[in-house]
């Protein structure tokens, strides 16, 4: 009887579940259709597809047709990939101003930090000239900060008809840079900006990073790093054949002789190990085997960074043109280097020959500095104390009511709200909650 009773209850529950499913299914389907119908009213939107997600009620990928040159739409157009995580029309919206490609945001498990913290809609915008947002043909003259800001303005304009609530722009690293420059060009598009680890470089080789690396961490940490660099340079004759074999196996090609590439990997090492917060204790002793030393060098600053067909070519073009970059201090290593100078390595190693005469334009950095000094928009900058990019951060901004700069003690390029101390985290969250409730 008990078994029969349990069985009957299960049958009743199953039937109820089926009825419930039938009742609920059309509602979610109509909600899905409703979103697609709403966004399709914008004729510049095409190719809308639903995506699997475990983090949003609904998620879509779509393309916005954008002018190559927003000042001269007659020059042609390209399709920009946009990924939308939909929560609700009454929720705040986070626009992620990605600095590179958007491939990783397609993952079902992906959700950006702020959209999760505030249960907000997410609009993730792939940067022009990366992955599926690359124009055909690829004419580099239209890859400018101003055009990228105009792209974001067009995306925001398209989606504000759906999401009339508060808007936050955010991005990480180059995406943080993009969020900053977007606010400069269109200060009223969003209510709040949260750039993470965003540099503001003043030159192709900015000059502030090398002194930073001479001060960061402890003296013992810096000595261990430099000792490792010197050791792999001293053993270059022994390590270079294996380095070359690995490059050959991976079909890497470079714009400079292999020994120079090896030298640049060693120069890059100190920047890279601090940038990503690698445990200094993981650095091998100078007495370690050849294989141990080379494996560690390749893991921290491998040669793929310098290859001819780099997936980051679009970024190097932007860095050389107006975003700026960093240089290397070669003085401690000069006796062991095959190069006499590292100056202008970005143009020589990273850019195609026909672009090497491109001059750096300071107009953008001057415009951003002027904007930050004269204005006080609601912005939160987040940096890591040990991240070399912080050398070019806006940590000099003082005495602002709305602009806040947080530096995570001991933090790296991975500094986020979630990695902060409880005290810092509470301050950031309190600011954001207050602004969203205004």
Predicted regions: what they are:
Residues 31-120, 423, 430-438:
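Catalytic-loop region of hydrolases
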Residues 1-14:
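Single conserved hydrophobic/aromatic residue that forms the stacking wall/gate
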Residues 142-161:
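Alpha/beta-hydrolase active-site loop
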Residues 381-383:
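Short beta-strand/loop motif that positions the catalytic acidic residue
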Residues 163-173:
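Alpha/beta-hydrolase fold nucleophile elbow
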Residues 189-247:
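A catalytic-pocket lid/entrance helix-loop region that shapes and gates access to the active site
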Residues 245-361:
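Alpha/beta-hydrolase fold active-site neighborhood
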Residues 115-132:
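Conserved alpha/beta-hydrolase
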């Amino acid at each position: 009887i008990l078994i029969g009773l349990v069985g009957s209850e299960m049958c009743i529950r199953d039937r109820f579940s089926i009825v419930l499913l039938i009742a609920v299914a059309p509602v979610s389907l109509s909600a899905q259709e409703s979103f697609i119908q709403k966004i399709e009213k914008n004729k510049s939107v095409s190719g809308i597809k639903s995506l699997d997600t475990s983090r949003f009620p609904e998620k879509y990928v779509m393309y916005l047709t954008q002018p190559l040159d927003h000042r001269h739409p007659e020059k042609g157009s390209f399709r920009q990939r946009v990924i939308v995580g939909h929560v609700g029309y009454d929720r705040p919206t986070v626009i992620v101003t990605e600095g590179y490609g958007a491939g990783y945001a397609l993952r079902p498990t992906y959700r950006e930090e702020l959209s999760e913290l505030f249960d907000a809609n997410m609009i993730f915008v792939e940067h022009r000239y990366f992955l599926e947002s690359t124009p055909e043909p690829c004419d580099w003259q239209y890859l400018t900060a101003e055009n990228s800001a105009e792209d974001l303005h067009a995306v925001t304009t398209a989606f504000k008809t759906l999401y009339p609530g508060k808007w936050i722009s955010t991005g990480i690293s180059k995406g943080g840079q993009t969020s900053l420059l977007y606010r400069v060009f269109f200060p009223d598009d969003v209510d709040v900006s949260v750039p993470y680890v965003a540099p503001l470089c003043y030159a192709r080789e900015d000059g502030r990073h090398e002194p930073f690396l001479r001060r960061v961490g402890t003296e013992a940490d810096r000595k261990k790093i430099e000792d490792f660099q010197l050791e792999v340079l001293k053993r270059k004759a022994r390590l270079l054949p294996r380095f070359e074999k690995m490059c050959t196996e991976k079909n890497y090609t470079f714009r400079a002789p292999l020994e120079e590439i090896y030298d640049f990997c060693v120069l890059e090492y100190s920047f890279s190990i601090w940038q990503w917060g690698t445990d200094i204790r993981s650095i091998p002793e100078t007495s370690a085997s050849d294989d141990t030393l080379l494996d560690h060098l390749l893991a921290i600053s491998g040669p793929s960074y310098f290859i001819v067909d780099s997936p980051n070519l679009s970024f190097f073009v932007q860095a050389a043109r107006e975003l700026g970059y960093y240089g290397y201090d070669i003085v401690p290593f000069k006796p062991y280097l095959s190069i006499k100078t590292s100056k202008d390595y970005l143009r020589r190693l990273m850019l195609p020959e026909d672009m090497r005469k491109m001059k750096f334009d300071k107009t953008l950095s001057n415009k951003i500095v002027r904007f930050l000094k004269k204005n006080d928009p609601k912005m939160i900058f987040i940096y890591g104390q040990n991240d070399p990019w912080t050398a070019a951060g806006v940590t000099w901004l003082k005495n602002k009511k709305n602009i806040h700069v947080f530096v995570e003690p001991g933090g790296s390029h991975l500094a986020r709200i979630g990695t902060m101390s409880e005290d810092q985290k509470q301050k950031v969250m309190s600011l954001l909650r207050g602004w969203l409730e205004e």
